[in-house]
Amino acid sequence: MNFVPPEEVVSPKANWRLVDVVLNKGEGDCAYAIGMWDNQRRVGFRWNGTDNSPIGNPQSRGLPTWTMLDRALHRAVLNQVAKKNPDKANIMRAFLGMPVEADD
């Protein structure tokens, strides 16, 4: 793994404060995180890098960065997190103020 891990991506520092990476699909694939964007709770997204392009996308001035998803997509991301990384789903629900669903 020669790409920048999403846990180490902290830019753009003027806007973003990483709280937790909730889903990391690995090299060359996507990662989702929860954090504070301009003092609002948001879901961030990025493409992890590869050996040939370790920074991934998006990037700015040679630094790996996060981009924010439309809030309308938060529930869809939560559904993916619940399937792929269930331990992080309740953290994400609590952080975003979404109701915790009871197990059947």
How should these model regions be labeled?
Residues V9, K25, D38-Q40, Q59, ...:
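Short linear sequence motifs
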Residues G28-R61:
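A short, structured beta-strand/loop element
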Residues D20-N24, Y32, R61-L63, T67:
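Generic preference for hydrophobic/aromatic residues in regular secondary structure cores
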Residues P5-P6, W37, G56, N85:
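Alpha-helical interaction segments
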